[in-house]
Amino acid sequence: AELVFEDCVVPKENLLGPLGKGFKVAMSSLDVGRLGIAAQALGIAQGAFDQTVDYMKQRKQFGRSLNKFQALAFEMANMKTEIDAARFVLYNAANRRDRGLPSTVEAAQAKLKCSEVASYVVDKAVQFHGGYGYIKDYPVERMYRDQKITEIYEGTSEVMKMVISGDIFK
């Protein structure tokens, strides 16, 4: 569908912002949306991590719980470190936004980092759950599906990289 407005006049009291600044207002709303998506991705990552910690403590393999296997435990350490790093990136961007500072690049960084961390963590969570991670009886299956959209809407990861690199090379 397409909307066409010809000779359309908007009364001054109905303007959403200063005349001629609509693009800037629209872009500013993207920053807030991207922070929300970053928070969603971070929540998904944290939830998948928490589910996996509980599962690994309970699940026995070769006579011991999964959390006793060093390779798996080390991967969980990496997952936690990535989640914490993503949280700091998100909190920094949100703090800048709250203080009225420019936050377009930081919001893009937060969305990129949090969505990529969610992808990594949820993928490992499903893997560590084995076949159970793929069935609807376990929450990580839903988290696996829910995570993917965080890399797409309000700008794909590639668009976030364009925003960030554009700032680097301006």
What residue spans do the PLM features occupy?
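Alpha-helical interface subdomain recognition
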Residues: 2-8, 12, 18-21, 25-170
